């Protein structure tokens, strides 16, 4: 899902920003659905996706109702612009050639998604102004996704330790290489 907004002044909530589009927001609605504008930053995998789930990035207050939107849009919906960029950890600086699209076969990628009056039909809108539920979604996402990243180094230690133990049990340290 597309969660990370550019944010602007981080000491202020969405409704307090000088530019209201620094957080994705509802700009209009009609009998068919809602229209959203804003942006989502650091979106890995979005260029390879068929659908994008838009959701808030921070806890919201009652003043932020227009920014309390969760919905699904096709990745090629009208009004979406992708500003493609490379990830800081890719290896292009070490590779030969003049191609500048990352590792053409397996490279990582990241994009800024700019939303300009992107339409979301009502059947794909999951939160519409209910700021209380948007905040709960952010918290759940944090619990399941963001916190799992903190554990990756610890998991690496466990895997390395297990591999070293298996090597010891199999006598690898005593074998000529």
Predicted regions and their residues:
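Alpha-helical interface subdomain recognition
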Residues: 146-177
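FAD-binding core of flavoproteins
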Residues: 1, 5-151
């Amino acid at each position: 899902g597309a969660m990370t907004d550019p944010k602007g002044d981080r000491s202020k909530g969405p409704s307090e920003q000088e530019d209201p589009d620094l957080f994705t927001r509802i700009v209009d609605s009609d009998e068919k659905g809602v229209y959203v504008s804003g942006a989502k930053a650091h979106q890995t995998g979005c260029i390879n996706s068929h659908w994008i789930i838009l959701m808030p990035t921070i806890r919201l207050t009652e003043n932020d109702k227009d920014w309390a939107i969760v919905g699904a849009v096709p990745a090629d919906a009208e009004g979406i612009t992708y500003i493609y960029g490379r990830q800081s950890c890719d290896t292009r600086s070490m590779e030969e050639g003049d191609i500048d699209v990352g590792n053409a076969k397996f490279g990582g990628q990241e994009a800024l998604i700019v939303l300009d009056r992107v339409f979301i039909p009502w059947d794909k809108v999951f939160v519409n102004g209910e700021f209380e539920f948007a905040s709960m979604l952010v918290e759940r996402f944090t619990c399941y996704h963001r916190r799992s990243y903190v554990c990756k180094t610890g998991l690496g230690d466990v895997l390395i330790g297990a591999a070293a133990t298996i090597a010891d049990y199999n006598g690898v340290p005593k074998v000529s290489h």
